[in-house]
Amino acid sequence: MKTLLLTLVVVTIVCLDLGYTRRCFNHPSSQPQTNKSCPPGENSCYNKQWRDHRGTITERGCGCPTVKPGIKLTCCQSEDCNN
C-alpha cells in the first residue's frame, strides 16, 4: 500500500511539472519554427521586428526587452504566444 501511495505521489509530481517554465518561440525571421524553455522566473515571450536593407527582420525569445525607437516590440505571457 505504501509503495502504491509513493508511486502516485511521484506520478503526480511528474504530471504537474512543479518546476514549470514558460516556453517561447526563438526562431529568426526566415527559419523553421523552434521553441525553447525559458529560464525559471521568466514568464513572458517577445517578438521584435525592424526593417533594414534585407527587409523585415524578426527576433523572438524569452522575456520582454527594452528596445530602441523604430523597433516594434510585442510581449505576451502564454505558451508559444510570440509567433
Curated annotation (Swiss-Prot):
Which locations, inside or outside the cell, does it occupy? Answer: Secreted
Q: What start and end residues bound the annotated signal peptide?
A: 1-21
User: What PROSITE patterns does this protein map onto?
Assistant: SNAKE_TOXIN (PS00272)
Q: Could you tell me what this protein is called?
A: Short neurotoxin OKI-01/OKI-19
Paired cysteines (S-S): C24-C45, C38-C62, C64-C75, C76-C81
Q: Which GO terms describe its cellular component?
A: extracellular region
Q: Indicate where this protein is primarily found.
A: secreted
**Which GO molecular function annotation, any one, does this entry have?**
ion channel regulator activity
Q: Which family does it belong to?
A: Belongs to the three-finger toxin family. Short-chain subfamily. Type I alpha-neurotoxin sub-subfamily.
Q: What does this protein do?
A: Binds to muscle nicotinic acetylcholine receptor (nAChR) and inhibit acetylcholine from binding to the receptor, thereby impairing neuromuscular transmission.
Expression sites (tissue/organ): Expressed by the venom gland.
Keywords attached to this Swiss-Prot or TrEMBL record, sorted alphabetically, are:
Acetylcholine receptor inhibiting toxin, Disulfide bond, Ion channel impairing toxin, Neurotoxin, Postsynaptic neurotoxin, Secreted, Signal, Toxin
